[in-house]
């Protein structure tokens, strides 16, 4: 076998079906859309969730809950990520954004205990989980709530 003799295996490549190009093709005239009606027209078809005039499911089901306008969403940082920093570094929200660990501070930063920490760091954040606080202090570091 030579490079110029390479061919795709049989049935692995399918030519696209061009519709509306003559009746001999089997897909001419109506282009596989049948005769007239909403689905034969351009842009035709029903909107998402439409059930033919029957009351749709999303309207039959009762409303639930609400959006709390006072909700605070914290950017989450796990312990294993903090190992990137050198020993003795002061980890602040600004530093976390700068290094690309988090995209933005949101309502603050919460440190969670996923993974383990080997470095001695001073971590400044808005919230700490109890296990994360324990782990940072066990590694010889400090936690500071801001």
Swiss-Prot record:
Basic and acidic residues compositional bias, start-end: 1-18
Matches recorded under InterPro entries: Ribosomal_uL15, Ribosomal_uL15/eL18, Ribosomal_uL15/eL18_sf, Ribosomal_uL15_bac-type, Ribosomal_uL15_CS
Comp. bias regions, Gly residues: 21-31
Protein task: Binds to the 23S rRNA.
Protein species of origin: Listeria monocytogenes serovar 1/2a (strain ATCC BAA-679 / EGD-e)
Stretches for region Disordered: 1-50
Nucleotide-binding found in the keyword field: no
Protein name, UniProt field: Large ribosomal subunit protein uL15
Chain's gene name: rplO
Keywords: Ribonucleoprotein, Ribosomal protein, RNA-binding, rRNA-binding
GO biological process, alphabetically ordered: translation
Subunit structure: Part of the 50S ribosomal subunit.
HAMAP family named in the record: Ribosomal_uL15
A GO MF term: structural constituent of ribosome
Family the UniProt entry places it in: Belongs to the universal ribosomal protein uL15 family.
PANTHER family registered for this protein in UniProt: 50S RIBOSOMAL PROTEIN L15, LARGE RIBOSOMAL SUBUNIT PROTEIN UL15M
A single Gene Ontology CC term: cytosolic large ribosomal subunit
């Amino acid at each position: 076998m030579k490079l110029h003799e390479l061919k795709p295996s049989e049935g692995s490549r399918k030519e696209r079906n061009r519709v509306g190009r003559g009746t001999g093709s089997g897909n001419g005239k109506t282009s596989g859309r049948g005769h007239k009606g909403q689905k034969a027209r351009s842009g035709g078809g029903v909107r998402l969730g439409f059930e033919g005039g029957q009351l749709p499911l999303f309207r039959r089901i009762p409303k639930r809950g609400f959006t709390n306008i006072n909700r605070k969403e914290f950017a989450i940082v796990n312990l294993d990520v903090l190992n990137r920093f050198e020993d003795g570094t002061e980890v602040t929200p600004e530093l976390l954004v700068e290094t690309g660990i988090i995209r933005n501070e949101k309502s603050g930063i919460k440190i969670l205990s996923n993974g383990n920490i080997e470095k001695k760091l001073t971590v400044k954040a808005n919230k700490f989980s109890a296990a994360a606080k324990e782990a940072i202090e066990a590694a010889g570091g400090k936690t500071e709530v801001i």
